[in-house]
């Protein structure tokens, strides 16, 4: 007689469709132990909209709503806006949660919008289980203001205590949540992942020679890639200066991304006499990213604030070795210095230049580290994420 598998009825409340979450929702919808419904507070990202970070209008060119059940909840805010507390006021969440029979509700909204509180109160009154997902890994805010750290230390324990389980995306995140007084048995590490199969498959089909030709870069050159918004906290200027200081023969630097620092970077590139060796591609959409990672020899994420950094996952899956600053959250779980990538002290241009100088011209080393990076990602995948979510559901629903 076959064992009866319990199926969890789960509502996922998400602020808006995200290119990283959609593949997870598709897999979750097919899992025999999950019956999910995704409730979106906004459809920004599906429709073209202005992205303040990129400084341009953005619409992702991969399907975000296919392959899983979802519903859009009307936003009753007079001034709809992501990232604003009163920008998401989705009153319909109340009736959805109160009238349907869910075993648990998972929040992907953050706590800084009114919709979270509307839904959280409904969950508590219905005696459903509340699972809160967060990618936070440090208490320090991006602007490093001390009063914000103090406020977080005071408020976050109370907020996270509302959850039956806090789902964190990294080991650093788990340590941070535990430091706020949340019991270890109430914290679940759910690996922050991308669609591993898609990235590996697309990378294997890339014509590197053709991509290099588009970039106007010789096929036998070595390429350092920066792929992120050109913003101050991403520190792209550190990468430019380290590249200039390393001065590796027959090497090029490619910036993929838009943002407020582009004009400054182009001026500095010109003043350094590197116009022929530094390429600015502008915004690159999702369907073209794998060709960039595969056509580069070394990837750099130099941020001084990066809770995780999923671009690291993407690069590693494409076999591109990574250099990350010690402020990048994924470094602890994914990047073992000298084996699956390299770590340097954030803002230390000399240290970064030294790594570039030693690694970029060493093709054998690049190949070895790139292969190890792909191997590491085998156990940091959507399948591990879903296993962890189901375990969190088992634990939370078994409690009275």
Enumerate the language-model features and the residues they cover.
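Conserved donor-binding/catalytic core segment of Leloir-type glycosyltransferases
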Residues: 218-234, 240-243, 254
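Short alpha-helical donor nucleotide-sugar binding micro-motif in glycosyltransferases
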Residues: 283-284, 291-296
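A short, well-ordered alpha-helix in the C-terminal region of glycosyltransferases
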Residues: 213, 277, 351, 358, ...
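Short hydrophobic beta-strand element within catalytic cores of glycosyltransferases
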Residues: 321-325
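Aromatic "clamp/platform" in nucleotide-sugar-dependent glycosyltransferases that forms part
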Residues: 304
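Conserved acidic donor-binding segment of nucleotide-sugar-dependent glycosyltransferases
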Residues: 336-338, 342-349, 358-363
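Donor nucleotide-sugar binding/catalytic pocket of nucleotide-sugar-dependent glycosyltransferases
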Residues: 149, 153-210
